């Protein structure tokens, strides 16, 4: 009588390794998509938080505050009246860079704020432009003129 030893054969181990490799490869591409989506949501939340803060600060300081979006550098620059707002919270000398934060890989695809790339709050907190800021071609921040209320939509 032939007895078998307990354990796994080399073929069984190779098959298990191949199956694990396929599962890991499939999940890593999905994980990358999830990571990009989290970064885009984080960037949208950062921008909308700054919009809310700028509206409040314009009323509190009784000064005009504006954002100038730069699609090429993935940044927005914040001005108080016509001067760079160098001590704006969360900025580096008035500039907020999406590529230098945890939001790297986020692209400001387009900005259309009444035909410009500038979002302005007057000293009463009134938003002088309305329009859209689009991130990575599928996340839109819609800002309403006058109220400055915003809405984040998937495209």
Where are these regions (language model features)?
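Transition segment at domain starts
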Residues: 41-50
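N-terminal helix-rich module
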Residues: 2, 22, 26-38, 42, ...
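N-terminal single-pass transmembrane signal-anchor helix
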Residues: 1-31, 50
């Amino acid at each position: 009588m032939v007895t078998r030893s307990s354990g796994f054969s080399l073929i069984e181990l190779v098959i298990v390794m191949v199956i694990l490799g396929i599962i890991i490869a499939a999940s890593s591409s999905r994980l990358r998509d999830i990571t990009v989506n989290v970064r885009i949501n984080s960037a949208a939340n950062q921008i909308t938080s700054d919009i809310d803060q700028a509206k409040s600060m314009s009323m509190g300081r009784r000064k005009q505050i504006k954002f100038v979006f730069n699609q090429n550098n993935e940044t927005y620059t914040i001005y108080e009246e016509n001067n760079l707002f160098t001590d704006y919270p969360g900025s580096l000398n008035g500039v907020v860079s999406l590529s230098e934060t945890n939001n790297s890989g986020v692209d400001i695809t387009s900005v259309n704020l009444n035909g410009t790339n500038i979002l302005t709050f007057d000293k009463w907190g009134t938003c002088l432009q309305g329009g859209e800021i689009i991130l990575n071609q599928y996340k839109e921040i819609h800002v309403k003129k006058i109220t400055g209320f915003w809405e984040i939509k998937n495209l």
